[in-house]
Each structure stands twice: as structure tokens, then as C-alpha cells.
Amino acid sequence: MPVPTGNRESQPHLTETSLPFPPLTEQHILNCTFSSWYNNFRRVSIKSKIIKPLPEEFVEYLHADGVFLPEQNFPDLEQQIWDIIDEFDGSVFPKLNWSSPRDATWISATNTLKCNSPSDIFLLLKSSDFIAHDLDHAFDDCYYDNQSDSRRHRPNEFELVLRKWYDVAPSMEFRCFVKEEELVAISQRDVNYYSFLNDIKEELETKIIQFFETHVQNKFFNRDYVFDVYVTRNRERVWLIDFNPFGPMTDGLMYTWEEILTATGPPSFRLITSQTEASQSRSRPFAVNRYPREIFDLSQGQTIAEFAEQFQRELAIAVSSSDEEENDNEDNV
């Protein structure tokens, strides 16, 4: 299994592990947990709701290998999800403490994170290596002064974050690298070629730097961190999307980590400048995460879309059966 991270989307080069990164502690990782920072930045971030703590039985379901229906239903959790979906006009996108299941959009009918029901959410979470990383490996890269120190393997509790769905333009997402409270690098996040970006590069750079200086600088818990932003299509607003650890588990995108660690002076801003560069800069995103073996084993000749529809249909039937059983029990009281 690759070593993915939430919005971190990382599979670090072996050479990066020997670079002089600032020591990364458990607290640095916990500070990037969504619920740790969202309230402080909610005015400049996407509308979101947090369900915490997740029932341990549901965590165990996510943790189990394979994509399958839960053996038991989670009516309280499902009702909370439905309530939030209704509040957010019918569509949300999910994440856990750190990660969104961006590597699992292949199983979605829309090839996006857009979810309209609990079954949509469960299917994405169960199909994602990024979510598996949150469950078991979030603290793998932490530094410990003493090898005998107790090492944390998971947070004390897990949370499900549901964020209001917007049809965003991937071309307007950017990743920002902060070293010792100074913005040192900005990278286009979706490594495809968008010709119009070069025409507005200076404007984008100015807006992102102003956003950082006004809303982020000296306001986050860590001195070294990575954050993602989205610039609206009309370029009138910048939205904070996420915070990520400053370390090799976070994808440097158009930079090597050596470049980021040695950067000085005003921040550099890199865009894909040609289709050729785009082809050289990427293989298909999350290609190594696509189509787990059990999908082929379980689908029995179905297409991925048909398998997803069957999963959602069977989950809906299971929930309905559970509701009928509860009603029968109530009638017998």
C-alpha cells in the first residue's frame, strides 16, 4: 500500500527523508486536525460541520480490509449525516481528521467527492488509502527525543467532517509553504496545464500573499506548515481549504522539498507553463491507489459504476430493514 495522506497526497522520495526538516512532533500533526483549526479560520474557510467522536464501531468498519456493507447499522450517525446534508442544500464532501478520500473518486458516479447520502460517504471512505493512512499512520513521521518514548499510533478520537459542496475549478487551487512563519513558495495544485493562469499569475500571487498576511500569518499553531487555498473564478475571494504538516509526507507538488527548505526571500510562485511540462510533471493522480483488488473480486463482471450503485442500494435496504425492525420492537413494548 502507498503511504498517502489527506490533502497531503504524498508518496515521498526516499532522499527526502534525509533532508533537514524541522522536528515534527505529535502536536504538530494534531494541530492540523480539522477541528483544531477550523473555528479560528471559519470566516475564511468553506462551511463545514464536524461529527465527533465517531463511534468506535464505525472506525473499526472503516479500518477493516475490503469494501463491504457494515455488519451493523449506525442510525444515529446516519441521521446526523442526513441533517447536515439537508442543511448544506443536499450535497457535501467528506474528510476525516486530516484526509479527504481524493484517491477514491474513481468509484463515484461523478468522479468527484460530491456526496448526497450516507452511502455515498461510506463508499468513498471505505475505498480510500488516504483514509486508511489517517486511521493507522498519521504519526509515522513524528520525531521522538527518546526511542523508548511512547509512540502514538492514532488520535484519541476520530471525526467526520462534512463540508458544503461547491463546483470549484481545480485550476484555481494552490498550495502554500510556510517556513518559520514566512511564506516561501506557492504551487499550482492541480498539475495540468491551464493557459489562462499565466495571464493572471501576478494577480493571483498578490491575492494569495495578501490573504496569508491578513488571515493566516502568525495565527496558526505551528511555525512551519503547509496550507491550501482556493481562489474564486472571479478572483474576488480566497478561501482557506486545509492545513498540512511541513514535512515529507506532504506533497511538494512543483517543488522538491530541498528547494522549499532552502528557499529565502520573497515567495516563488510556480505554474505549469505548457502541456509538455504538465505531462512531465505528473502521472495520473493517485494511479497507484485506483481499483483495489477486492473491487474486482466482488464486482463479478460489473462495471465500477454498477458496483457502486449496488453498494448504495444494498446499504439503503439494510438501513430500511433496520428501521422496520426498530418499529416492530417499539410496537411490542
PLM-predicted stretches and their roles:
Residues 1-333:
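Preference for protein termini
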